[in-house]
């Protein structure tokens, strides 16, 4: 399925998310979240890991049974249209936060947050304001 919003890049906010595989306690709920809600496709998968892709972004997940959700990180996705993406997530049954404007490094961004319930990951989606 083609989507109007383009994911341009990903970077970890307080972790290596997007650069290293993200630990998850169970693969299935995360693969479902990434595909159904976030609009990723499965690029590769085995019993212990999955690679997921949307546009220019690839995320990797690895099963880590002793992963503590309290240590889960956050990541920032640079996207082409936060308003359309937020609506896409609402249509998929998610509950994203409101769009707000924040300043970081002297630049202003329109962004919103979406929390993942399985392992406590927090995703931020933004674009220059």
Labelled PLM ranges:
Residues 1-10, 16-26, 53, 66-129:
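Vicinal oxygen chelate
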Residues 30-35, 89, 120:
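Conserved active-site tyrosine of GNAT-family acetyltransferases
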